[in-house]
């Protein structure tokens, strides 16, 4: 797991560049030390991958087109592919550290168009109303997912069968998220999260709203 203190973009885009992301195993694990980012925040960005995260310590605020959500230590969640988002370190008393699984859905679904993709993956990632699936302590079902999520970050890449064990852990978590998202999937979305023009417009507005309009 790499410690990260900054974000990289594809040239001319706000799509995040993911160093170390390989086609033969489309996955990276990161430990984001938010306090070391410039300004203590990760600017607006998006990526084509799933973002599954757990708050190790501190608290952060996620901002998406749908609103803001605060995640304290012990909470976590999933960010759907192609969702524009930014994060900001909130806690002033302890380090703001976030653990992240970043992966392409093919890691779980296998070949594009597979039965697994059609039944369990596509219904979530193609639902425009699902930007974030938040998970908080205090809810029994969500606590079960959080426990599995925290444990998944303790897997070592040096141990025998790591890739298979990791995929198994992520698959179990995904199935629970799939069930958790049922009510969200039944609601109709009103925005198109894959519209790049809207992404760029929102980024421009948020980056320049303090400037005087001439």
Feature roles, as predicted:
Residues 146-150, 201:
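Short, Lys/Arg-enriched alpha-helical recognition elements, typified by the DNA-recognition helix
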Residues 1-76, 82-83, 118, 129:
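Generic protein-terminus/edge-of-domain signal
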Residues 28, 123-124, 148, 155, ...:
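Residues that form generic nucleotide/phosphate-binding pockets
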Residues 82-107, 113-116:
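Ligand-binding loop in jelly-roll beta-barrel domains
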Residues 61, 86, 208:
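Detector for the N-terminal beta1/A-loop initiation region of ABC nucleotide-binding domains
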Residues 115-146:
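Aromatic/histidine-rich interaction motifs
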Residues 39-46, 63, 88-90, 110-113, ...:
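Short histidine-centered beta-strand/loop micro-motifs
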Residues 131-142, 155-212:
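Short, Lys/Arg-enriched, Trp-marked, Pro/Gly-tolerant hinge/linker segments that flank
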């Amino acid at each position: 797991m790499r410690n990260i203190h900054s974000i990289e973009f594809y040239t001319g885009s706000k799509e995040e560049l993911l160093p170390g992301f390989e086609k033969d195993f489309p996955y990276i694990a990161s430990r984001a030390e938010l306090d070391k980012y410039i300004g203590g925040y990760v600017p607006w960005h998006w990526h084509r991958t799933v973002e599954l995260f757990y708050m190790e310590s501190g608290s952060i605020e996620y901002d998406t087109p749908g609103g803001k959500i605060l995640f304290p230590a012990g909470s976590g969640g999933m960010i759907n592919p192609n969702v524009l988002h930014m994060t900001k370190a909130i806690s002033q008393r302890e380090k703001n550290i976030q653990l992240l699984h970043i992966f392409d859905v093919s890691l779980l679904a296998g070949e594009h168009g597979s039965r697994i993709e059609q039944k369990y993956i596509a219904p979530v990632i193609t639902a425009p109303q699902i930007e974030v699936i938040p998970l908080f302590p205090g809810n029994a079902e969500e606590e079960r997912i959080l426990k599995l999520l925290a444990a998944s970050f303790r897997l070592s890449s040096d141990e025998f069968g790591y890739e298979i064990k990791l995929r198994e852990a992520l698959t179990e978590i995904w199935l629970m998220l799939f069930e958790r998202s049922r009510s969200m999937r039944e609601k109709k979305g009103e925005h198109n999260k894959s519209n790049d023009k809207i992404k760029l417009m929102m980024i421009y507005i948020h980056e320049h709203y303090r400037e005087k309009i001439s």
